Amino acid sequence: MTNIRKTHPLLKILNNSLVDLPAPSSLTSWWNFGSLLGICLAVQILTGLFLAMHYTSDTATAFNSVTHICRDVNYGWILRYLHANGASMFFICLYLHVGRGLYYGSYTYTETWNIGIILLFAVMATAFMGYVLPWGQMSFWGATVITNLLSAIPYIGTDLVQWIWGGFSVDKATLTRFFAFHFLLPFIISALVMVHLLFLHETGSNNPTGIPSDLDMIPFHPYYTIKDILGLLIMLTALSTLVLFSPDLLGDPDNYTPANPLNTPPHIKPEWYFLFAYAILRSIPNKLGGVLALVLSILVLAIVPMLHTSKQQSMMFRPLSQCLFWLLVADLFTLTWIGGQPVEYPYIIIGQVASILYFSIILILMPLIGIMENHLLKW
């Protein structure tokens, strides 16, 4: 008798995606992050759902409702901190996942890569709107500063900002709509994930060597299910350690002060996972230029496939490209550090140099090194 998982219309889809999926035999732990991101999304949706049952999206009661969740709701504190720190875990996995794609040339699967970029934007938008919901000082001023950037758009800028605000400042209407979109977007993200996987399974997975592995495939289960479970245990250990021992480590103390439109915090900054983009934004003196650089800091990933000049897909056998890749990683750490510092000497100039280096590596140096390595291979 044929196994039900191979014949049932619904189970067949799951079977072909998780059980009998042919996978390259050489996948390393860098290929774990897709499943970890799926788990992160599930955790965020579940904790968010339970938080939404107790949260009120009204400027008068939002801050108090979060306090109520932490103090009075059964295990509300763990829900709140799992959700807040789960977002950090989400972004750690996201950035490692994108980094893996850049290193091993997975961007050559353009459909999968482009859906991935859309997913990255969607997750960033969701995280930004979620940060506004507790209605602390940094929530309010972060929302004001970031939405105000749209006023740099010529002609329609000011109208656009007031349309998003639902008034002449960040107020009740803004909070309500941000809550609505913050609730909606994860489900849209879930749908996009399905499309992401659909395109991935059209081409099959890449592997560390960048060489086609059609001749050497193994079933996803049990080999990679076990491997993914190990990654999951490590991630859950890290997340639960963070939540149970220092839940406010990655947060901002200013967010424990209720939002006050009359009092500006000394340093307005977003959560740590946006600091690199925030540093790029601040490093350009012109407002419109800064906004364009901010958007391009992520959108630049979309043109990476067009800039691939090497004859090899992966960087595994390309030491010069590897050096450049790790320079890019170091540069992103520098930008993240600069984004959290005040706007003064020497941080301004460091931020500007790091921003120029970021775009130079991706747009100029990587393609040039690829061409150079092609010539070196002829010797």
From Swiss-Prot:
Source lineage? Eukaryota, Metazoa, Chordata, Craniata, Vertebrata
The protein in question is named: Cytochrome b
Miscellaneous information on this protein: Heme 1 (or BL or b562) is low-potential and absorbs at about 562 nm, and heme 2 (or BH or b566) is high-potential and absorbs at about 566 nm.
Family named by the database record: Belongs to the cytochrome b family.
What keywords sit in the KW lines?
Answer: Electron transport, Heme, Iron, Membrane, Metal-binding, Mitochondrion, Mitochondrion inner membrane, Respiratory chain, Transmembrane, Transmembrane helix, Transport, Ubiquinone
Segments passing through the bilayer:
33-53, 77-98, 113-133, 178-198, 226-246, 288-308, 320-340, 347-367
Q: How is the cofactor bound?
A: Binds 2 heme b groups non-covalently.
- Binding of heme b b566: at which residues? 97, 196
